[in-house]
């Protein structure tokens, strides 16, 4: 069931400088916490478009947000299709866009989704259960070199080669079908001293697989660039990230859009192409308060960055 504590709720939504009659997008509807608070700040003339690729999330949010009626429109699609979907709905610009890139707790807590190393379940990890690629296919079919690449790039796992080698060894004799079986393989591959420090030994590998299954980083990069393009002047984008890979993409995208490229000498007038597109509002990311961390330990790695369209 969708019971989920929303992270950095007021900071992320208030950071959008809500206009009561504005048009807003929640790219990561999830359990609907950010959307609900955002809708409460809108007048009857305001509008929210809420994206999620998880059908269960949309079904839950329809009930939770039913009182807002036609003020909220749900879009069951990955946020990388942000511009395409809004264009089809006749929306050319928006006043604010919100991203919360954490996997929602219900997805983590439903064993059958296969996201968690805490429960034994089929190796799945699909946000959109209609897509074909699963974690089981990656683990059992992808070559050693590809496994090393995703474990190192997406999980920043220093024992990527050892884990990939152990997976290759085990799958020669039998397929690795469940999260529990994969955890055992990971534990067997990682040296004992490393297993005893730095959190659960499977954490980084599971993160890497989840990102690879859902193509999360590329989808986010594409969606963030589209969001910036869609913003009206004065519109804002709020991004909550939970690990360094996402945060790096956000930070670099904001930085690039807030700087002028090097100018050719002798230009009498600054062309529009050379003007910065964004103003960064958060020089340093906003992090959860001690009080929020006490209420919700899953918020501990959250970072919020906000930028405004010029």
Swiss-Prot record:
SUPFAM superfamilies: Putative methyltransferase TM0872, insert domain, S-adenosyl-L-methionine-dependent methyltransferases. Gene3D superfamilies: Putative methyltransferase TM0872, insert domain, Vaccinia Virus protein VP39. GO terms for biological process: rRNA base methylation. GO terms for cellular component: cytoplasm. It is found in: Cytoplasm. The keyword Nucleotide-binding does not apply. InterPro entries: RsmH, SAM-dep_MeTrfase_MraW_recog, SAM-dependent_MTases_sf. The keyword Acyltransferase does not apply. One of its GO terms (molecular function) is rRNA (cytosine-N4-)-methyltransferase activity. Its main location: cytoplasm. Specifically methylates the N4 position of cytidine in position 1402 (C1402) of 16S rRNA. This is Ribosomal RNA small subunit methyltransferase H. It comes from Geobacillus kaustophilus (strain HTA426).
């Amino acid at each position: 069931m969708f019971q989920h504590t929303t992270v950095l709720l007021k900071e992320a939504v208030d950071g959008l400088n809500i206009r009561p009659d504005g048009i807003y997008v929640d790219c990561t509807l999830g359990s609907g916490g950010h959307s609900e608070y955002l809708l409460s700040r809108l007048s009857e003339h305001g509008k929210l478009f809420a994206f999620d690729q998880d059908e269960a999330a949309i079904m839950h949010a329809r009930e939770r947000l039913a009182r807002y009626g036609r003020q909220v429109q749900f879009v069951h699609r990955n946020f990388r299709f942000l511009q395409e979907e809004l264009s089809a709905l006749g929306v050319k610009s928006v006043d604010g866009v919100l991203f919360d890139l954490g996997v929602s707790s219900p997805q983590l807590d439903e064993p059958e989704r296969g996201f968690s190393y805490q429960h034994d379940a089929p190796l799945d990890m699909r946000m959109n259960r209609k897509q074909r690629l699963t974690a089981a296919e990656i683990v059992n079919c992808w070559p050693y070199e590809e496994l090393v690449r995703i474990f190192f790039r997406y999980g920043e796992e220093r024992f990527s080669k050892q884990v990939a080698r152990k997976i290759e060894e085990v799958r020669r004799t039998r397929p690795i079908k469940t999260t529990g079986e994969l955890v055992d393989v990971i534990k067997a591959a990682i040296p004992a001293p490393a297993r005893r420090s730095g959190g659960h030994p499977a954490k980084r590998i599971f993160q890497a697989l989840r990102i690879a299954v859902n193509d999360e980083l590329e989808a986010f990069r594409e969606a963030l660039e589209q969001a910036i393009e869609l913003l009206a002047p004065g519109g804002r984008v709020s991004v909550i990230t939970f690990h360094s890979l996402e945060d790096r993409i956000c930070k670099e995208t904001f930085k690039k859009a807030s700087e002028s490229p090097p100018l050719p000498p002798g230009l009498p007038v600054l062309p529009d192409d050379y003007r910065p597109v964004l103003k960064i509002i958060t020089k340093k990311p906003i992090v959860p308060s001690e009080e929020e961390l006490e209420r919700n330990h899953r918020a501990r790695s959250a970072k919020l960055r906000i930028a405004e369209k010029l």
